Amino acid sequence: MSAAISIALKVWGDLACYTIPEAHVERLSYPVITPSAARGILEAIFWKPQIRYELDRITVLKPIRFTSIRRNEIQGTVTVKGASGVNAWMKDPSGYEPYLVDSAGRDDVQGENRTQRNSVLLRDVAYILEARLIVIKPTPTDPPAKYREMFTRRAAQGQCVRQPCLGIREFAAYFAPPDGTETAADENRDLGIMLYDLDFPTDGPVGARPPECALFAPAKLEHGILDVAAMRRNLYRRA
């Protein structure tokens, strides 16, 4: 039997991109952080196998503004395994061959890696994430309040398991506990069908469990507040 307790976190940053699945090449961001991205931020600050997070509400603190940038990106990725992968390079650095962003005119296997892509991003964002911290099997010596105190302490001290990001790894998220003076932006938007989260199987090793499907739901921003609990009541699956 599980038990839950409420937590809240303020996050902000200069740039953010919560990519709409249909626009993953020329990236186009949702106007608001997705529940799955918000959950990822919470897990980046504090995570243990016996807990999980369930978002209830997201408050948008600043007006929604977009910006567009064009960047040089690469068409391929570096492999981990194999004779030319990262693992082999770690064992024998002499065999390291850099993966070049601009290799125009090269005749080897890398070919022409560079490609220019446009991205429509959010700028100057800030949110308050309200969620339930769920303890899977609480005990008298391991209550939910214990984990909330650990989460709040880590958030106040700027500690994290890994650097949380705002949709893309290079867009770092700053975070702190809310101070109670924040006010929601006066934004009202029909966000359409939004990605809620990915559905992972519950059996097998954690690192070897690809998502079975994606979960989507209708989303609406009312006076700067996204009701994630209402989204959860209208989920549908997409393979």
Predicted regions and their residues:
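N-terminal, Lys/Arg- and Ser/Thr-rich interaction peptides
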Residues: M1-V25, H223, A229
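A short, structural micro-pattern
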Residues: A3, R52, L121-V125
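Residue-level detector of short, conserved catalytic/binding motifs and their immediate flanks
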Residues: I7, D56, Y127
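Beta-strand elements of well-folded, non-transmembrane domains
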Residues: V11-L15, K62, L129-K137
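Short helix/loop capping segments that flank catalytic or ligand/cofactor-binding pockets
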Residues: T19-I20, I69, T139-P140
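Glycine/small-residue-rich interface belts in oligomeric ring/scaffold proteins
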Residues: A23, L28-N72
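Internal, well-folded beta-alpha domain core
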Residues: E73, A83-A239
